[in-house]
């Protein structure tokens, strides 16, 4: 009898131990890079290396790719706020209507156009509670993580709500710790010698001044490094809480101003780059070092085996004018055309890597396409959160089957973009008021101002040099119908003509 009781007790302890092991939730880190081009890395996301892969040094992106899966067709919006609002809400930008970048309350950031009256979009961003005009109300996945036992940390750029609105503060979206996140989508300077945009009395000299880094003022610490050190301190605290953590490491790099990160600048000067391009390269490598520092922390603290890392860019690399990059412009994302703000691939295709120990096969590559709003259901599925309810419909589709190589959620799926806006102060290929659809190999861009439609076969023409709309009218018609139907279904916005006051036709209303 005694032996039977001892055996039963031992089995009970074993079963309980196994159950606890099975219930252990993974830590999750989302490492989002600002304005990073598809080619701003030594890791080739194309089927061949380019001069940019040879130019830049990102050893930790390569390290992460060896541990996980690269995605060669990861898409986002061409501008920061729309991407970040889609990430947080799981909604396409056409639905949430934060279609351009946000900053000041009730103030549009649109540029001017002689032809179009631009729509009254959600200039105040997103919110989790109603009561603020020109916002989209939705529950963030971070709030759902927190409700399900995660310690949630925000570090760096937020940029999903205007000044003096609920969306300005990441803590209103489920983050328990907020490091430097506020309304601004850029930064005044990366330099501690300039107090990251504050005067000697501590007053911000710009709306873009980075808050919360006073400890690093006048220390010679580049902003990317300061944010990394603060993130590591937050992880040290999180480890003591004995609960899984979610870290949103959202760097301001590689956003303008293109300041010199002197830890790496001279290396690139010695490679023969100009001051501007060497500074740009130094921002990239500083970001990569941050990734490596976080990976090192995970290994040192025994958390690497239970931590998922997702790496993503928020929009295309900065390739236009304003004096930040050297000529020739619009080529810096080669083989993709153009960059940030453009409907062409250079504006919307992002570098992406996911490492998930014991789930994702190391050193793999996925050529299926996905969209930024897919992160919402994916991260919740990774965390084992299945039963959740949100006031907003979720447009995103989990890409966990791609990670596990058990299915293809992109099969038969269309991706959609709507940018009924003008990116102020910038001009170049595809930088205009547009709506776009990607379906299989085909991509259709509709220009609101002119009614022009461009059709590209992306696998055959990744640079979008050959518009084949005239030779494939049937495909143009089909994609126009799909795009028009989708935009109507989500109550998307569109401009109107100044000359008549009439709304611009939907793409399926124009031959």
Question: What are the roles of these predicted feature ranges?
Answer:
Residues 52-58, 75-79, 110, 128-139, ...:
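A short beta-strand-to-alpha-helix junction
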Residues 177, 182-185, 318-345, 360-364, ...:
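C-terminal cap/loop subdomain of S1 sulfatases and analogous C-terminal strand-loop tails that border
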Residues 103-151, 158-243, 251-260, 278-281:
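Formylglycine-dependent
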Residues 222, 226-239, 266-307:
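A long, amphipathic alpha-helix that forms part
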Residues 22-26, 33, 38, 70, ...:
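Long, internal low-complexity/basic segments
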Residues 166-174, 256-263, 296-359, 371, ...:
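Histidine-centered active-site microenvironments of extracellular/periplasmic hydrolases
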Residues 49-84, 90-95, 151-153, 173-182, ...:
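Short, structured active-site-proximal loop/turn typified by the sulfatase FGly-forming signature C/S-X-P-X-R
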Residues 45, 70-91, 99-106, 154-166, ...:
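Short, solvent-exposed turn/loop segments enriched in Gly/Ser/Thr/Pro and often Arg
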């Amino acid at each position: 009898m005694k032996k039977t009781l001892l055996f039963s007790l031992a089995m009970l302890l074993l079963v309980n131990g196994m159950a606890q092991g099975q219930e252990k939730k993974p830590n999750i880190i989302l490492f989002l890079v600002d304005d990073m081009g598809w080619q701003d890395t030594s890791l080739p996301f194309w089927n061949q290396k380019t001069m940019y892969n040879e130019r830049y040094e990102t050893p930790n992106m390569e390290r992460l790719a060896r541990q996980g899966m690269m995605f060669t067709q990861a898409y986002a919006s061409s501008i920061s706020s729309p991407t970040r609002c889609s990430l947080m809400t799981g909604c396409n930008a056409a639905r949430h209507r934060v279609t351009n970048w946000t900053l000041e309350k009730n103030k549009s950031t649109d540029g001017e156009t002689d032809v179009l009256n631009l729509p009254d979009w959600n200039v105040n961003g997103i919110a989790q509670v109603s009561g603020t005009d020109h916002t989209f109300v939705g529950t963030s996945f971070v709030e759902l993580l927190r409700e399900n036992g995660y310690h949630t940390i925000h570090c760096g750029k937020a940029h999903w709500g205007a000044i003096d609105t609920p969306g300005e503060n990441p803590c209103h979206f489920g983050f328990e710790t907020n490091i430097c996140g506020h309304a601004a989508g850029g930064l005044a300077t990366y330099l501690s010698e300039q107090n990251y945009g504050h005067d000697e009395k501590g007053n911000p000299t710009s709306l873009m001044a980075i808050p919360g880094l006073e400890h690093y003022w006048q220390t010679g610490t580049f902003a990317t490094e300061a944010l990394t050190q603060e993130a590591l301190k937050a992880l040290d605290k999180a480890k003591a809480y004995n609960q899984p953590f979610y870290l949103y490491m959202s760097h301001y790099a590689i956003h303008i101003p293109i300041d010199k990160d002197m830890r790496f600048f001279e290396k690139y000067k010695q490679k023969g780059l100009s001051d501007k391009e060497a500074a740009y390269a130094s921002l990239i490598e500083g970001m990569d070092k941050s990734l490596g520092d976080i990976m090192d922390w995970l290994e040192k603290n025994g958390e690497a085996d239970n931590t998922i890392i997702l790496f993503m860019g928020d929009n295309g690399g900065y390739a236009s004018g304003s004096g930040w990059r050297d000529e020739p412009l619009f080529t810096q994302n080669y083989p993709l055309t153009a960059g940030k703000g453009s409907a062409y691939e250079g504006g919307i295709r992002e570098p992406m890597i996911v490492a998930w120990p014991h789930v994702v096969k190391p050193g793999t590559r996925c050529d299926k396409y996905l969209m930024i709003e897919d992160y919402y259901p994916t991260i919740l599925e990774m965390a084992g959160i299945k039963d959740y309810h949100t006031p907003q419909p979720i447009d995103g589709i989990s890409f966990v089957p791609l990670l596990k190589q058990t299915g293809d959620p992109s099969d038969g799926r269309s991706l959609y973009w709507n940018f009924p806006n003008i990116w102020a102060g910038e001009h170049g290929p595809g930088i205009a008021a547009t709506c776009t659809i990607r379906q299989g190999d085909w991509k259709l861009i509709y220009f609101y101002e002119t009614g022009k439609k461009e059709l590209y076969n992306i696998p055959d023409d990744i640079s979008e040099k050959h518009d084949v709309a005239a030779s494939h009218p049937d495909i143009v018609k089909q994609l126009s119908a799909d795009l028009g139907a989708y935009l109507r279904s989500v109550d998307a916005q569109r401009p109107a003509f100044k000359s008549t006051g009439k709304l611009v036709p939907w793409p399926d209303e124009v031959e």
